[in-house]
């Protein structure tokens, strides 16, 4: 019995199944927005035990812009010295760079899963708990849970470029502690 036609049919079905069911379009959680072609995930540059990623920049129909970051803990655990693990993130904050200011930010949101969002009114505070860091930051008071991604959103009035060298801080448990790192964030206005 010649199995070649059967193998070819099975292979064709497998390829079609992967194409049809292997990819899914993510739903648009805000029907007043459209995807901006400037989106490009960018991870942290240095010094954070957490993975901070600029997930997307969205141009909204009302001419505002939504920036979404995610944070995850790639080595969740107790943070005990020598364990190779990191405690859950408690909170983190970003500086606004040299071109953006707090008056350009309409509101912020945090989400433990990217689905349910809690809005907050962003404000700038001077960070004093991280040794050697004294820059004003916008804090996100939501952390991470194990290795799950948490999401953070800021809606701004102006179209801003992206810069890879924004200063940021993280706060964790007593064993992992706090620190400063560099990440992708607000650059200067673009057309």
Language-model segments: which ranges?
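Bacterial N-terminal signal peptides that target proteins for export
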Residues: 2-10
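Bacterial signal peptide processing site
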Residues: 24-26
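Extracellular or exported targeting regions of proteins
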Residues: 29-191
């Amino acid at each position: 019995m010649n199995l070649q036609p059967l193998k070819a049919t099975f292979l064709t079905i497998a390829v079609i199944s992967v194409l049809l069911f292997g990819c899914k379009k993510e739903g648009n959680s805000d029907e007043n927005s459209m995807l901006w072609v400037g989106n490009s995930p960018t991870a942290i540059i240095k010094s954070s035990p957490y993975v901070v990623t600029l997930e997307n920049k969205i141009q909204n129909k009302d001419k505002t812009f939504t920036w979404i970051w995610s944070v995850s803990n790639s080595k969740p655990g107790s943070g005990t010295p020598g364990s190779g693990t990191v405690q859950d993130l408690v909170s983190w904050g970003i500086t606004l760079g040299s071109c953006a200011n707090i008056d350009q930010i309409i509101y912020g949101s945090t989400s433990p899963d990217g689905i349910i969002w809690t809005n907050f009114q962003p404000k700038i505070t001077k960070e004093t708990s991280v040794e050697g860091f004294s820059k004003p930051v916008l804090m996100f008071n939501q952390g991470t849970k194990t290795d799950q991604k948490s999401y953070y959103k800021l809606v701004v009035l102006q179209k801003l470029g992206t810069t890879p060298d924004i200063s940021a801080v993280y706060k964790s448990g007593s064993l992992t502690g706090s620190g400063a790192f560099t990440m992708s964030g607000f650059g200067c206005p673009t057309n």
